[in-house]
Amino acid sequence: MDAIVAQLNIDMIGRNRDDKASESNTVYLVGSDRISTELHEVNRAANAGLPKPLSLDYEFNDPADLEQIHFRSDHYSYAAKGVPIIFFTTGLHPDYHANTYEVSKIEFDKLARITQLVYETGVRVANLDHAPVRDNKGPRAGRHTE
């Protein structure tokens, strides 16, 4: 575990939250600032460098979020051991864990843009001459969008 400097997790990135067209540019980030604010800043810089930056939303990162998504996905076992993480998601939708999910509902352009952001973030982390600083400042409360 000591050799792992960060964990980037993607889950449910091909749809818009609640299938709202207004969410077509949004990706929700969870945990990016909880363990390492440096990792958070690396991700923000990677997004700013994209040809078409995404709207970064931290609503699900709020400790008061009722869904408690920070504790519900594959990244959490790393975070619990102190590894800086970012969970990229587009939120829940009507077909979440249902048999009504169809390929025709996937927003492939959005999926590709988010995947590019994850890649660019990973490359920037890999090219650091140090592991992202683990300052453990914790999440920012409230909804934040960039």
Task: Please give the residue ranges for each predicted region.
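Metal-dependent peptidase/peptidase-like ectodomains
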Residues: 1-87
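His/Asp/Glu-rich mid-to-C-terminal helical/loop segments that flank catalytic regions of hydrolases
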Residues: 89-146
